[in-house]
């Protein structure tokens, strides 16, 4: 039985993936010596929602020294422009970092958040990227908490408003591959917690 079609009108998924693809060249470390690039991260990815709780960090920090996760938080304004549905989307980019090469996690997170904000505001940078307008109301906020600090992680959030079409079809080829996940289970009260980071095989060529 074939998989049914899934309508995407009103969705921010395509917009969020557009932001991810825009930011990757500015924020991801790549190529030889990537593990020594302190002011970049290993991965920029789309996230399902707010990312500010210590409980989430085990899943996303596995085998990483930091990352950036992009989420659409709300759409405070939507309107039809001709035959197209356009929304003003409130995005948040969560920058999370651990210490690296003896550079402090809080300094890394703040520096990368600044690099991210600067990339968002490059004049003409969004031409041809799918957005209707350049970002507005760009802000950065320190999400320090005792819980995240105990996990050895610092988090900064960069937020902004940006107009995007909301009825663009989702391209499965642009979505993150589900290749790794964090498993956690309690077998019984008081029993040891079973935890594991599981890597799945990649797609068959």
PLM features: residue spans?
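Small/polar-rich, solvent-exposed N-terminal microdomains that initiate assembly or binding
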Residues: 1-81, 183-205
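Acidic-leaning, charged glycine-interspersed low-complexity segments
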Residues: 64, 106-171
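Short, solvent-exposed beta-strand/turn "edge" segments of beta-rich domains on protein surfaces
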Residues: 60-62, 78-86, 147-153
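Oligomerization/assembly interface segments of phage tail-like spikes and tubes
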Residues: 85-100, 152-166
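Short C-terminal domain-edge/linker segments immediately following a structured domain
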Residues: 99-107, 122-128, 188-200
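Extracellular/virion structural assembly segments
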Residues: 11, 83-88, 96-124
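C-terminal tail/extension regions appended to the core domain(s) of diverse proteins
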Residues: 155-205
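Short, cysteine-centered beta-strand-loop-beta hairpins and adjacent loop/turn segments enriched
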Residues: 78-81, 98-104, 165-171
């Amino acid at each position: 039985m074939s998989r049914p079609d899934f309508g995407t009108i009103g969705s921010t998924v395509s917009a969020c993936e557009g932001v991810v693809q825009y930011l990757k060249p500015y924020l991801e470390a790549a190529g030889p010596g990537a593990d020594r690039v302190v002011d970049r991260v290993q991965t920029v990815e789309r996230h399902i929602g707010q990312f500010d709780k210590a409980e989430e960090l085990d899943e996303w920090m596995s085998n990483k020294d930091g990352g950036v996760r992009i989420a659409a938080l709300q759409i405070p304004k939507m309107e039809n422009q001709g035959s197209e549905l356009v929304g003003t989307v409130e995005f948040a980019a969560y920058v999370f970092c651990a210490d690296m090469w003896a550079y402090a996690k809080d300094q890394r997170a703040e520096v990368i958040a600044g690099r991210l904000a600067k990339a968002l505001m490059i004049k003409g940078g969004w031409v041809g990227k799918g957005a209707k307008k350049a970002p507005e109301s760009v802000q950065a906020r320190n999400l320090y908490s005792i819980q995240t600090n105990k996990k050895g992680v610092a988090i900064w959030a960069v937020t902004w408003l940006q107009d995007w079409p909301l009825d663009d079809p989702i391209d499965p080829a642009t979505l993150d591959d589900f290749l790794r996940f964090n498993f956690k289970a309690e077998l019984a009260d008081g029993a040891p917690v079973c935890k594991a980071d599981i890597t799945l095989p990649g797609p068959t060529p």
